[in-house]
Amino acid sequence: MNTPEHSQLGKASAYADQYDASLLFPIPRADKRAEIGIDGNAPFFGADLWTAFELSWLNLRGKPQVAIAHITVPCETPHIVESKSFKLYLNSFNNTRFGDASEVQARLRADISEAVWRGAPHPATVGVKLIAPELFDQEPVHELDGLSLDRLDVECTRYQPAPDLLTATFNEAPVTETLTSNLLKSNCLVTGQPDWGSVQISYSGPQINQEGLLQYLVSFRNHNEFHEQCVERIFMDLWTRCKPIKLKVYARYTRRGGLDINPWRTSHPQTMPKNVRTARQ
């Protein structure tokens, strides 16, 4: 079984100059999900929205081509792809010749799908969209919509996940609201390098205490876990402690190595958010 410790994270790595799909390093989701009480099917839907800003290859005449890639990985895949391995994989395209962008897109879709669905009884595919340079100026920047929790003047003293900070008002009428924060920070599971993010929480149900929610989000500050795992932990803590009727958690993390990862989890099927970067991304 692949584990994060066996990946290229935190290690000196050689950069392949020719296409090599074997560089992709899938890591099972199940182990970390078991830590937060998920055994078997997860109680949410969603996806991990990746943006690759450093994608380049050669055309058949050897001229470099560039594109931005939007990649959608369903959360029901049995694996995630470790991000440094994904960067190394993308770099292996740099000196490889392809007929056109559609050939690159098809190769990305096939390779990533194989990695994240590996061993699944009914494998499916990931979504891959390439943005050509002439469309770069149509890539928007927009902050997450919602009421900012960061306006609250709270005292913060806990910097490891503290779900006991989450409370809700169960004896009053349910509410529907969307709350945001730019204060999410966690650390890479293996290297301890800081990961900076913004988070949006939309729910219907007993009203969640906003001060406690902000303190809870801040409590991830010294926590070592991958982006996808942090968002699922937030979802499960809110789901079990605040008992919403509906819940959506969506985080957008700043890029590293030319990649950003933006996990989205929802209790009910709904339209996937557009992969639109924030100013910090």
From Swiss-Prot:
Q: Which GO terms describe its biological process?
A: queuosine biosynthetic process; tRNA modification
Is Transferase set as a keyword in this record?
no
An example of a Gene Ontology cellular component annotation for this protein is: cytoplasm
Catalytic residues, chain numbering: 188, 195
Listed GO molecular functions? preQ1 synthase activity
Catalytic reactions of this protein: 7-aminomethyl-7-carbaguanine + 2 NADP(+) = 7-cyano-7-deazaguanine + 2 NADPH + 3 H(+)
Main subcellular location of this protein, as a coarse class: cytoplasm
Q: What class of enzyme is it?
A: oxidoreductase
Question: Keywords for this entry?
Answer: Cytoplasm, NADP, Oxidoreductase, Queuosine biosynthesis
Q: In which pathway does it act?
A: tRNA modification; tRNA-queuosine biosynthesis
| Protein localization | Cytoplasm
Q: What is this enzyme's EC?
A: 1.7.1.13
The record lists substrate as bound by 81-83, 227-228
Which SUPFAM superfamilies does the entry mention?
A: Tetrahydrobiopterin biosynthesis enzymes-like
Residues annotated as binding NADPH = 83-84, 256-257
Q: How does it assemble?
A: Homodimer.
**Family according to the record:** Belongs to the GTP cyclohydrolase I family. QueF type 2 subfamily.
NCBIfam families (UniProt xref): QueF (TIGR03138)
* UniProt function note: Catalyzes the NADPH-dependent reduction of 7-cyano-7-deazaguanine (preQ0) to 7-aminomethyl-7-deazaguanine (preQ1).
* Protein name as catalogued: NADPH-dependent 7-cyano-7-deazaguanine reductase
Q: What is the lineage of its organism?
A: Bacteria, Pseudomonadati, Pseudomonadota, Betaproteobacteria, Burkholderiales
